[in-house]
Amino acid sequence: MAERSYDFLMPSVNFFGPGVISKIGDRAKMLGMKKPVIVTDKFLEGLKDGAVEQTLDSLKAAGVDYVVYNNVEPNPKIRNIKEVKKLYEESGADSIITVGGGSAHDTGKGAGIILTNGDDITKLAGIETLDKALPPLIAVNTTAGTGSELTRHAVITNEETHLKFVVVSWRNIPLVSFNDPTLMLDVPKGLTAATGMDAFVQAVEPYVSVDHNPITDSQCVEAIKLIETSLREAVANGHNLDARTKMVEAEMLAGMAFNNANLGYVHAMAHQLGGQYDAPHGVCCALLLPYVEEYNIIACPERFAELAEIMGENTDGLSTRDAAELAIKAMKQLSEDVGIPHSIKEIGAKPEDFELMAENALKDGNA
């Protein structure tokens, strides 16, 4: 008999591989979408033959009308989701397609939440607070990555208080996700590093979570191996399709893992840094990871010793504690190799803000 029971959440359909973006029009039509709001940013919208252009071409070919919202910001704000809601209602839209990285997906999810569950999203922060389904949602992913294209998390920033909060619900999971690595070949080095380290953290945290299970363990292990062997190359040579493909596989695995085994204090604290200083989420996560996990070693040293081996470190002859410390060293080295800043000072962190951020981190859905 199993020692415990657990739920396992996944999107119903995931398209993966070079060229799959061409299928989005037919899939949107199959879902009954007649006029989706395309949620993206100006940069992606302006790319010739980029993700947005290919999405729109496929929709046109399938006879699906659309309207475009192109004002997605990093660390999406409440004002962004309200803008999408307004466009949705005024244009007579019936669905949402997000095109971008985590910010686009969170903006689309946030808009969907307030379209059906009430206008004040701050009251919905927490776990499984949504009573009503979102409008039909498809996510086209362009970074590897937050995993937001297939998870139940919507992360929004209150621009007035600088508080970053999470709405966690199975209702947020997109009906369909698209991960086409050819759309990621021109992602800049800095963004590749930041999003890649976010994926790494999202594989590490569920592995040492109290909610881990055999399914999520296998996903975390493979994701960590893929990132350890592919992220450096993806940063150094963005047009290496094999490295990009492996990073997409890794971020999908990590996303499925933390969708079920959850995250932890790295993300709870990173949300506060990002909300307070509008700093890149992946950079915040990477900066905090080794220090939070060094603190956590005492809770499960054997899991961290396993992480060292998964990352390719030689633990022969080492005590469990020493092997666990080797995992922390390997985490720092990976961040160093891909150009992550060395200190939170470099993203503008100020000691006078620490107490408030600590209080808010304890209220975060990942704490």
Residue ranges and their predicted role:
Residues 1-95, 344:
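ATP/NTP phosphate-donor binding region
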Residues 21-24, 47-49, 78-81, 103-110, ...:
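Short glycine/serine/threonine-rich phosphate/pyrophosphate-binding segments
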Residues 304, 314-367:
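C-terminal charged capping/lid subdomain of soluble metabolic enzymes
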Residues 22, 116-212, 303-306, 310:
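A glycine/threonine-rich phosphate-anchoring loop and its flanking beta-alpha core
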Residues 206-330:
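Active-site segments that bind and position negatively charged phosphate/pyrophosphate groups
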Residues 39-40, 100, 157:
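Short beta-strand/turn micro-motifs composed of small residues
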Residues 88-128, 134-142, 269:
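A short, small-residue-rich loop immediately preceding and capping a beta-strand
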